Structures are given as C-alpha cells and as structure tokens.
C-alpha cells in the first residue's frame, strides 16, 4: 500500500532527476565542444539557475501541489480532488496544458522576466489617451479577483516616503546648487588666471630668448666679418711674401736649376687658404734648411780633404 506522501516524494524525485539530467547534459555538451570545465563550478551554476527557474516559474510548486492532491485522493481525502474534478476528468489534456504552461514559465524566467513582472503584467494594462501624452492604468479581472480575496496590500512606507519627497525644500536645494556653482566658477576663474599668468610668463621668456638669440646672431656676424678681414689680410701678406721671395731669388747669383726649383716650391704655396699656406711655407723652409745642411756637409768634406781646418765665430 502506498504511503501518505508517496506521490509527493515521487514528484520531488523527478525534479531532482531533472536537475541531474541538466548537469549531465551541460557537461556532455562542453565535452563534445572540447571545452575544459570545472565540474563543481558547472554543478553550482546549473543548480542556481535550475532552482531559480523552477521556483520563480512556479513549476515546482505546481507539480508538488498536484502530487499532494493525488496523495489526498489516495488517502480518501477527496476535498482537493473534488475541487480539481475538471483536471481529473481528462488527465492527458491537463498534463499537456500543464507542460505547456510550465515550459512558458521557465522560458520567461530564464529570460529575466521574473514572477513579479509576470504578475504585474497580468494584473494591469495601460490604455493610451488619443492626443495626449498621459495614459490610463486599467485593472484586469485577475486584479479584481485578488482584491476580492484580500490578496492586495498597501505599503505604508511607500506612502510616507512619497509624502516626504513632496515636502522637499526646493529653496535650500537651489541655494546649495547656487553655492556649488559659485564655488565651481571661482575654481575655474582661478585656474584660468593661473593659466594666463603662466602663458604671459612663457611669452616673456620667449621674447627674452629671442633677444638673446638676436644678440648672439649679431655677435656671430661681427666675428664672421672680422674673420673674413683677417683672412684677406693673411692672403695679402702671403702674396706679398711670395712676391718678395721671388724678387730676392732673381737677384741672387744662383744656378738656374736651383732658382727654378725654389720658384716651383714658392709657387706651390696656397695663397687662398691661409692654413694650407702656412703648411706650404713650413715645407719650403724645411727644404731650404735641408739643402743648406747638405751644402754645409759637402763643404766640410771638401775642407777636410784639402787638409784644412774650419771654425765658426768671429775673432
């Protein structure tokens, strides 16, 4: 013989089995897609969602309520069974309707449309007034039935809060906003004035730097002019030096080949670039000293071969 709550226990068992089937289906789908997962995490997520949908949609309470009715009928308590005689008359039709209703409820719950929103939408409807922006809120038959059954309550805290909102001191609010605006205005003006001072100082520094650059450029131009003058003077001096040496060389009683060699060295002096000219003069002087040294050695050797002695200095 069945126990008093056997049908209710079977309904709870079916709900638990449905949850386990949902967990297995979720993990199997993840495995087929090759996605790594944490079983405990999946189990916890599915349980939270499953419990919310079953409770918010009313499916769990609906199934357990029908199971309780069956248990009462099996235990000769026909009060609930008589109230549900239409359901008992055609169980297959009622089961199909319950299945569709439960499916729709769970779909709405999974989409975020909870029980509160469903009840409010079922209790009220909105009627637009043509030509106006306002509308009329109409109570449905469900709302009227709830009023008759005493299932509607008035939240006094909401009324008190509303009254408190209606007594807001708008003058003090305006004064506070005005003070905040003045404070913000003063801060903006202060920042603007600081920016103007910084910009003015930067402009002065820029003009001062431009003056320094102009002075430096003028000084550089003066140095360039002086340098050009020195370069021209050196070129003239070098030209005069080479001309004087050539004239003096022509007045000497030297061998023509020696004169030609010395003239060639003098003509090789660069009179355009003073730096190169000094290098050329150094080379000419070195060659003259070398020639003089060779001549002295030759003269010394000649004196020694003639058994003569030589000395330097004046007696």
From Swiss-Prot:
Its main location: host cell. One of its GO terms (molecular function) is RNA binding. It is found in: Host cytoplasm. The keyword RNA-binding applies. Residues 170-234 are annotated as: Interaction with host ZC3H7B. Residues 166-237 form a coiled coil. Residues 1-149 are annotated as: RNA-binding. Keywords: Coiled coil, Host cytoplasm, Host-virus interaction, RNA-binding, Translation regulation. It comes from the Viruses. Residues 150-206 are annotated as: Dimerization. Homodimer. Interacts (via the coiled-coil region) with host ZC3H7B (via LD motif). Interacts with host EIF4G1. Plays an important role in stimulating the translation of viral mRNAs. These mRNAs are capped but not polyadenylated, instead terminating in a conserved sequence 'GACC' at the 3' that is recognized by NSP3, which competes with host PABPC1 for EIF4G1 binding. The interaction between NSP3 and host EIF4G1 stabilizes the EIF4E-EIF4G1 interaction, thereby facilitating the initiation of capped mRNA translation. This is Non-structural protein 3. The lineage of its organism: Viruses, Riboviria, Orthornavirae, Duplornaviricota, Resentoviricetes.
């Amino acid at each position: 013989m069945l126990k008093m709550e056997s049908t209710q226990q079977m309904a709870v068992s079916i709900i638990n089995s449905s949850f386990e089937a949902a967990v297995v289906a979720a993990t199997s789908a993840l495995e087929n897609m090759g996605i790594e997962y944490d079983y405990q995490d999946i189990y916890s997520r599915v349980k939270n969602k499953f419990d919310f949908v079953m409770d918010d949609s009313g499916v769990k309470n609906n199934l357990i309520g029908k199971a309780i009715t069956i248990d009462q009928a099996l235990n000769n308590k026909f009060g609930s069974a008589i109230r549900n005689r239409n359901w008992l008359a055609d169980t297959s039709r009622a089961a199909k309707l319950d299945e569709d209703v439960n499916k729709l409820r769970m779909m709405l719950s999974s989409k975020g449309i909870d029980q509160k929103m469903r009840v409010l939408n079922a209790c009220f409807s909105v009627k637009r007034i043509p030509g106006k922006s306002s509308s009329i809120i109409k109570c449905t038959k469900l709302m009227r039935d709830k009023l008759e059954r005493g299932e509607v309550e008035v939240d006094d805290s909401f009324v008190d809060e509303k009254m408190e909102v209606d007594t807001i001191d708008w003058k003090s609010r305006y004064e506070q906003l005005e003070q905040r605006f003045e404070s913000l205005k003063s801060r903006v003006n202060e920042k603007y004035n600081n920016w103007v001072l910084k910009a003015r100082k930067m402009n002065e520094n820029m003009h001062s730097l431009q003056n320094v650059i102009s002075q430096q450029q003028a000084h550089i131009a003066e140095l360039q002019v002086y340098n050009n003058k020195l370069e021209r003077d050196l070129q003239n001096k070098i030209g005069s030096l080479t001309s004087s040496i050539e004239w003096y060389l022509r007045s000497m009683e030297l061998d023509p080949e020696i004169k030609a060699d010395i003239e060639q060295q003098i003509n090789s002096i660069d009179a355009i670039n003073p730096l190169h000219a000094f290098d050329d003069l150094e080379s000419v002087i070195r060659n003259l000293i070398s020639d003089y040294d060779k001549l002295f050695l030759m003269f010394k050797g000649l004196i020694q071969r003639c058994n003569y002695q030589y000395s330097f200095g004046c007696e």
